[in-house]
Amino acid sequence: MDKNLNQLLKWSIEAQTAANAGQSHHSHGAPTSNNSGPAAGTGAVATSPAPQVTGSGPRPVDPEILASLFGGPSEAELMKAAMEVITDPSPETTRENKLIAFDNFEQLIENLDNANLLDQLALWSPLLSLLDHEDEDMRYHAAWCVGTAVQNNQKTQERLLAMGGVPKLVDLAMKEGESEKVRRKATYALSSAVRNYQPAMDVAADEMHKRGHEVLLSNGTKVDAADMDKVDEVIDCLRNKAKSA
C-alpha cells in the first residue's frame, strides 16, 4: 500500500479517536469561555501558522499526506487500506483502530460498485477469515460487512457462495456458546445472502439440516428464495435461537 495513503488512514483514525475523547471530556463538565477566541490554557494561538496539538489529539498531518488526500485516493484504495489496518498483526495497531477501520470499510461497501470490487481487490478471503477471529467484536463486524456487501446484489451473493461463505455464516449463526449479538449479525448476513438467490438458499438449508434444523416446507419441498414470507420464517427461527443463546 502507498506510504502516504497508509499514514493518511492512520491520521484519520487518530483524529476520530481524539474527537471521541474530546466529546466525552466536554460532556463531563469541561469549563467553557465566553471569549470568542481560543480557550485559555490550551496553548493555541490564533495567529500561529502551525498550531500544536496537545494531549491525545492527532499529530499534525504533513504536506505530503495532504497532497495524497487532495490527489484523491480512490475508494478502492481506501478499502484496501482499511483491510490492511483490520488484519494488521502488529501490536502498534490497536483493537480500537481496527474497529474504526471496520466501520469505515462497512460504510464504503454500502456502495454497490464498491461491494462489487471486493473480488477484484482480493478482499473476500481476508473478510471471511475474520468470521473466525478470536475477538467477538471482530467476528461481529465481519458478519456485518458480509451482510452489507451481499444485500440485494446477486454478483456478490455469487462470490460469497463460491468462497464458501454461506456455511461459515450458518455455523456462526447456530454456534453454541457464541454471543447473541454475533449470532444475530450472522443471521442478518445470511438473510442478505439467500434472498432471491436460490443456490445460496439451498446451501444454507443443507448446512442447517446438518446441524439438526430442517428447512423444508410441509410438503417436503425446498424453500423458494424468492418467497420472502418463507425466507422470513427461516431467518426468524435463527433469530429466536440466537435470543436463547
Walk through the language-model features, giving the residues of each.
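Generic beta-strand or strand-like secondary-structure segments
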Residues: P126-S129, H141-T148, K168
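Internal, Lys/Arg-enriched amphipathic helical interaction segments that engage polyanionic partners
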Residues: E64
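Onset and early core of a folded interaction/catalytic domain in large eukaryotic regulators
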Residues: M83-E134
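Short alpha-helical interface patches
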Residues: A115-D119, Q154-L161
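Low-complexity, charge- and small-residue-enriched intrinsically disordered regions
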Residues: T17-A21
